[in-house]
Swiss-Prot record:
Keywords: ATP-binding, Cell inner membrane, Cell membrane, Cytoplasm, Membrane, Metal-binding, Nucleotide-binding, Protein transport, Translocase, Translocation, Transport, Zinc. It is found in: Cell inner membrane; Cytoplasm. This is Protein translocase subunit SecA. It comes from Ehrlichia chaffeensis (strain ATCC CRL-10679 / Arkansas). The keyword Cytoplasm applies. HAMAP family: SecA (MF_01382). One of its GO terms (biological process) is protein import. ATP binds at Q86, G104, E105, G106, K107, T108, D499.
Length: 862
């Protein structure tokens, strides 16, 4: 029934493409008119468009001429003309949708259309990439086009300093990575003044490789943290005990990535702990005093049984470096949380670093949803269209290719064992190599890529390896993977963002070959020779069948497999793709149904013999779909909890910004409310007789908060609670009036400066502890379901109560810190304020964890 409706009305995707095609016709209709403009007149169009927007026109009103101007500028500056399908892609981006375009269809150029149009409003456009290399490359490459139209372009890399960042954010268009943008947001909300902040708002973002950033990294929190005191030696002690455990002592759930001790394991580990004097003989492992020990054990088990070197992480310069499971790239600076990273360091016998406490955090899901308009580009988004729509309200639109795809996708070959599979892979590569067909082999881990490399070396097949160990050469290696006879091994989607061009990448080859040539004539001759060679090599590669992509294992996500296939057959080039699988592969072993294995056995699988069947391929896709659905459910569930924290983050950051934006502060409102709370908590009756206990309680609180000693003889004469409160308010009024007078003796603004700094420091201090408390609450909240309670509702209620409590502490802490302030006016008339405040256990000479680059004592530890 659905297919009949599609035939009559067309799919949603085809209807969108059809409607946008009419806009493309309008753009094409004025192409000749725009061609007649001089370079200056073309550039002046930007000023005209901005005037039209000021006079009431919308971006949609000027889309047609704006896109035509960008296309003409691109022809003149880059010698690249936007195809009609690229114009459709640009419209999709402008409309706040995801443009799914196949590899090689020119996504980088497509982004210029929507970026230019939206930059005309002057509110800023952010083009987001997955790494610094792509951000720098695209900013320099497309920057020439924007410059020709009078549009400013900025680029932020990891090493960019604060001043350069601020200037870049003030540009019309900014290129940067998701990590840089997210951490800048967190750092800005740890700054002490608006002037120190670098970002200017969240107007419009175009996210390149949107599936990688908004899906694959959705569960990865962005965290700024500082070290906390911890018993580091305990990790080593517990790690030594893990070797004593046998398989029957623990149960591993690979599907859910869980591990726990069996009854036999609990008994064994308890005895080992007692033997090593880590717990007393009359206690249980699950006693309240031993909960922290249980935490160390769980993380040590996970480190040993669930995480593997060269798959989940590598050891580099004596440190554990996490490997991104989706891209195969190193994630420098990232650390596993909750003690897992320390457990891995203990496992690998490395120096153990202290666990960190979160100072500020957010997720990419919540960060990118702050933008007024969001759009994205990728080669593979359709399989995750439900998630994009459900979480980000982003519709996926599949853009037709400029030239039909010529790639042939062969059926999967399935073998009994991994050894048989890899032997067949080597044989297949060898056959391709004989006819000079370029080959790209995708593996799921560094371990597998290096194992395959050894087999190729053994068979005397020259090749390049692209994995996290060789990240620096990534772009060059992948760019030359289309040269005839080239064999390239890549982990997952390493090199994503760089096209594989048949015959080789002329631009990169020229950059290397011409680096040491200075003579202009010699450069021209060499460049011509390189061009001829690339064209010859391209023809040889085409005759050999184009790029052959080999997958050595199916990924949990169909999208990752499609990305690998998509490296072949760019812009109508011929190509080939094939997957080699075995029953020992993780996907088939963990998620493949017994039905698949049963059918394969009935078919009589023999050694070194592959089985091909469309039914088996469909069954594998069903297994992948199950995993994708489960992962989506996990992300959706986590998002509901993250949304609670995100709402609180907005409240706290909004409060912080209000403090920063104020020039003067009336703290009397705060301390009068505080005094009322103190009196009401100690004196319960309106009329009372002051006894020693009541006086001591009042005096103790006032000394603690205000550093004031109450006079017993004075307050003992009051007959009502209201009179006591009135006297206390007057006492505190005098206390702060004297303090303000002392602070403003040389500088009228000194007191307000002090109040602002104390308020900001107090809020940061409490927010840090509040985040830790929320993390602890979230870790155990699912246990509430045992009592037939909804964990999410329980989390919302308790988190709200905790926030209220935090804000109460905040106001008290402000008054307490201001009351205990010391001041010192030096002879040179510059005022130095000394705070008698314990802020953190971070060394004062360490760099501040907020990321400012300053020493802690000159920043948040001031």
């Amino acid at each position: 029934m659905l297919s009949i409706a599609h035939k009559i009305f067309g799919s949603t995707n085809s209807r969108i493409i059809k409607s946008f095609h009419k806009v493309v016709q309008d753009i094409n209709a004025i192409e000749h008119e725009i061609q007649l403009l001089s370079n200056e007149a073309l550039k002046h169009k930007t000023i005209e468009f901005k005037e039209e927007l000021k006079n009431g026109k919308t971006l949609d009103d000027i889309l047609v001429p704006a896109f035509a101007v960008v296309r003409e500028a691109s022809k003149r500056v880059l010698n690249m003309r936007h195809f009609d399908v690229q114009l459709i892609g640009g419209i999709v981006l402008h409309k706040g949708m995801i443009s799914e375009m196949k590899t090689g269809e020119g996504k980088t150029l497509v982004a210029t259309l929507a970026a230019y149009l939206n930059a005309l409003e002057g509110k800023g456009v952010h083009i987001v990439t997955v790494n610094d290399y792509l951000a720098k490359r695209d900013a320099e490459w497309m920057g020439e086009l924007y410059s020709a139209l009078g549009i400013t372009v900025g680029c932020i890399l990891t090493e960019t300093n604060d001043l350069e960042r601020k200037n870049a954010y003030n540009c019309d268009i900014l290129y940067s990575t998701n990590n840089n943008l997210g951490f800048d947001y967190l750092r800005d909300n740890m700054k002490f003044s608006r002037d120190e902040m670098v970002q200017r708002g969240f107007n419009y973002a175009i996210v390149d490789e949107v599936d990688s950033i908004l899906i694959d990294e959705a569960r990865t929190p962005l965290i700024i943290s500082g070290q906390v005191d911890q018993d580091i030696k305990m990790y080593k002690k517990i790690d030594n005990l893990i070797y004593e455990l046998a398989e029957e002592d623990y149960e591993l759930e690979e599907k859910n990535r869980n591990i726990f001790l069996t009854e036999a394991g609990i008994t064994k580990i308890e005895n080992l702990l007692i033997q090593h004097n880590l717990i007393s003989s009359n206690t249980s492992l699950y006693d309240i005093d031993n909960i922290i020990i249980m935490h160390y054990i769980t993380q040590a088990l996970r480190a040993h049984k669930m995480f593997a070197v060269d798959k989940d992480y590598i050891i580099k310069d004596g440190n554990i470096v996490i490997i991104d499971e989706f891209t195969g790239r190193m994630m420098d600076g990232r650390r596993y949380s909750d003690g897992l990273h320390q457990a891995l360091e203990a496992k690998e016998k490395l120096n153990i670093n202290s666990e960190n406490q979160t100072l500020a955090s957010t997720t990419f899901q919540n960060y990118f949803r702050m933008y007024t308009k969001l759009s994205g580009m990728t080669g593979t988004a359709e399989t995750e269209s439900e998630e994009f729509l459900g979480i980000y309200n982003l519709q996926v639109v599949q853009i037709p290719t400029n030239i039909p795809v010529q790639r042939i996708d062969l059926n999967d070959d399935i073998y009994c064992t991994e050894e048989e599979k890899f032997n067949s892979v080597i044989k297949f590569i060898s056959e391709c190599h004989k006819k000079l067909q370029p080959v790209l082999v995708g593996t799921v881990s560094i371990e597998k890529s290096e194992m395959l490399s050894k087999l190729l070396t053994k068979n005397k097949l020259k090749h390049s390896v692209l994995n996290a160990r060789y990240h620096e050469q990534e772009a060059y290696i992948i760019a030359q993977a289309g040269i005839p006879g080239t064999i390239t091994i890549a982990t997952n989607m390493a090199g994503r963002g760089t096209d594989i061009q048949l015959g080789g990448n002329l631009k990169m080859l020229a950059k290397t070959a011409l680096a040491n040539i200075t003579d202009k004539e010699a450069i021209e001759i060499k460049y011509k020779q390189l061009t001829e060679k690339v064209n010859r090599d391209k023809e040889i590669a085409i005759q050999a069948g184009g790029l052959c992509v080999i997958g050595t294992e199916r990924h949990e996500s169909r999208r990752i497999d499609n990305q690998l296939r998509g490296r072949s057959g760019r812009q109508g080039d011929p190509g080939l793709s094939k997957f080699f699988l075995s029953l020992e592969d993780d996907l088939l072993r963990i998620f493949g149904s017994d039905k698949i294995k049963g059918v394969l056995q009935k078919l009589g699988m023999k050694k070194d013999e592959a089985i091909q069947h469309t039914w088996i391929s469909r069954s594998i896709e069903k297994a992948q779909h199950k995993v994708e659905s489960r992962n989506y459910d996990i992300r959706k569930s986590l998002l509901k909890f993250d949304n609670v924290i995100n709402e609180q983050r907005k409240v706290v950051f909004d409060q912080r910004n209000k403090i920063l934006d104020s020039d003067s502060y009336d703290i009397s409102i705060i301390y009068r409310d505080l005094n009322s709370d103190i009196v009401n908590s100690i004196i319960h009756d309106k009329y009372y007789n002051l006894d020693d206990d009541t006086y001591k309680a009042l005096s103790s609180e006032f000394t603690r908060i205000y550093n004031i000693t109450l006079d017993y003889s004075t307050i003992s004469n009051f007959e009502s609670k209201d009179k006591v409160l009135e006297h206390l308010n007057e006492t505190v009024d005098e206390h702060f009036a004297q303090k303000i007078e002392e602070f403003t003796l040389k500088d009228q603004k000194a007191w307000d400066h002090v109040v602002k700094k104390v308020m900001i420091m107090s809020l940061d201090y409490l927010w840090r502890d509040h985040l830790a408390a929320l993390d602890s609450l979230k870790c155990g909240i699912n246990l509430r379901s045992i009592a037939q309670k909804d964990p999410l509702n329980e989390f919302k209620a308790e988190a709200f109560s905790m926030l209220e409590n935090m804000m109460s502490k905040f106001y008290e802490l402000i008054i307490q810190r201001l009351s205990h302030l010391k001041f010192d006016i030096e002879l040179n008339d510059t005022q130095r304020i000394e705070y008698n405040i314990h802020h953190s256990k971070i060394s004062r000479n360490e760099k501040c964890p907020c990321g400012s680059g300053k020493k802690f004592k000159h920043c948040h530890g001031a």
